[in-house]
UniProtKB/Swiss-Prot annotation:
Its EC number is 2.4.1.283. Pathway: Antibiotic biosynthesis; neomycin biosynthesis. GO terms for biological process: neomycin biosynthetic process. The keyword Isomerase does not apply. CDD domains: GT4_WavL-like. Glycosyltransferase involved in the biosynthesis of neomycin by mediating conversion of 2-deoxystreptamine (2-DOS) to 2'-N-acetylparomamine using UDP-alpha-D-glucosamine as sugar donor. It comes from the Bacteria. This is 2-deoxystreptamine N-acetyl-D-glucosaminyltransferase. It comes from Streptomyces fradiae.
Length: 421
């Protein structure tokens, strides 16, 4: 089977540095890379068209059956606090349409797989490219405007209806749809309406993330500048508005008086378009000596980081599933956060007392503090849940994806995904 994979977001683990203006690596990028490799190992031939950044080869063979092509039209380097660069995703779509025009003759796919994150441009890619290459498309909602997305700015709020309409359009014309959670699948099927049997749930996979020995993990974070002798409260991922970094800083301001826990150090592991804004907020709060910013780290460092944390904090505005939460818990670390989206299913099924209403910074501070002061109880609870987490978010993800592809390719042509007008 040949699959053309279209996604602005893809993890390039062949490099050790990642320019933040090209939208720093996050969970979606890592998950798509992981899925692509697992499918290639199962014999699915794939061509990935993604944004990339200067310094990457224009095209590379990641492994047999998996080619990754940097597909981006030229654009001025005007910084954006939401997408890294102004027009980055538009430049990707323009280049994709140009690159796909000859594919019908040179490398015709059996299926186009589009990965959408709640932004307009990937949603437009499916219907347009499907027509260009003469193949059906399936659509994965890594974040859904209809089910979980929260607008990130005033302009984003203004265009929210437009993008939600584009999501409906793309869903109705997809041969098959997948979501990360049953919650989103049910919501999307109800709102369109769409035959629920045509929406598959393909959650993120934890892959080979496992805990490392605690002394080794602590030594690693010390090498990043995290001091010894104090609890480590962590943030892992993209530094962006929707991840709630402002509330993380506000929590740190309240920590000494409101957490009930010893004085902590706050480790920010990752990068993103609002990194400098977060640094400025930390300095303005007088907390510069309590924060460590590691910047971008290769994903193979995640097990060491997650193992070394006393608690991972996720104050996200919206979170479709929360891959970082899964990785932390598999490594034995409790997670405190807001009860939004998929965190209600992942963290909520393990330590529900550590989830609090979105925006309640005081409650978030108390929850994170409880994870530190009552560490033995919470860690025992998390450890007991690991077998179930590995079962739900482990090796069978690739089997589900293969079945999803078989159903999409084998379905009789004509019409969309069984939608009712």
């Amino acid at each position: 089977m040949r699959v053309l994979r279209l996604t602005p977001f893809f993890h390039h683990d062949c490099v050790t540095a990642w320019p933040a203006e090209f939208d720093a690596v996050g969970g979606m990028q890592v998950q798509i890379l992981r899925l692509s490799r697992e499918l290639a190992d199962r014999g699915v031939e794939q061509l990935v068209m993604t944004v990339g950044f200067p310094g990457l080869p224009r095209e590379r063979v990641d492994r047999p059956g998996l080619r990754v092509r940097v597909t981006r039209a030229p654009l001025p380097r005007l910084r954006s606090e939401l997408t890294g660069l102004v027009g980055l995703n538009q430049a990707w779509l323009a280049a994709v349409l140009t690159a796909c025009a000859p594919l019908r003759r040179t490398w015709r796919p059996d299926l186009v797989h589009v990965h959408a994150d709640g932004q307009l441009w990937a949603l437009l890619a499916g219907p347009l490219v499907s027509r260009l290459v003469g193949a059906p498309y399936c659509l994965t909602l890594h974040c859904s405007r209809l089910a979980s997305y929260e607008p990130m700015s005033r302009f984003d709020r203004l265009q929210h209806r437009l993008v939600a309409a584009a999501e409906r359009y793309a869903l109705r014309r997809a041969r098959r749809v997948s979501t990360l959670t049953s919650r989103t699948a049910d919501t999307v099927a109800r709102l369109l309406p769409l035959d629920r049997a045509l929406v598959d749930v393909l959650p993120d996979s934890v892959g080979d993330v496992r805990p490392v020995a605690r002394p080794e993990a602590e030594e690693y974070v010390r090498s990043l500048g995290v001091p010894a002798g104090r609890p480590v409260v962590g943030w892992v991922g993209r530094v962006a508005h929707e991840k709630g970094w402002r509330d993380f800083v506000a929590m740190a301001e309240r920590w000494d008086a409101g957490s009930g826990a010893p004085g902590a150090v706050f480790a920010v592991v990752g990068d993103g378009p609002q990194r400098e804004r977060m640094r400025e907020a930390v300095e303005a709060a007088g907390l510069a000596d309590r924060f460590v910013f590691t910047g971008f780290l290769p994903h193979d460092a995640v097990p060491s980081v997650m193992t070394a944390l006393d608690v991972l904090v996720m104050p996200s505005a919206h979170e479709e599933l929360g891959g970082s939460a899964l990785e932390a818990m598999v490594c034995g670390t409790p997670v405190a956060g807001y009860a939004v989206g998929g965190l209600r299913d992942t963290v909520g099924s393990v330590t529900p007392s550590l989830l609090v209403p979105r925006g309640d910074v005081a409650a978030l501070t108390r929850a994170a503090g409880d994870a530190v002061t009552d560490a033995e109880r919470h860690r025992k609870t998390v450890a007991a849940a690991v077998p179930d987490l590995l079962g739900r978010y482990g090796a069978d993800t690739v089997e589900r994806a293969l079945e999803h592809y078989r159903l999409a390719v084998g379905r009789a042509s004509g019409g969309g995904a069984g939608w009712a007008p």
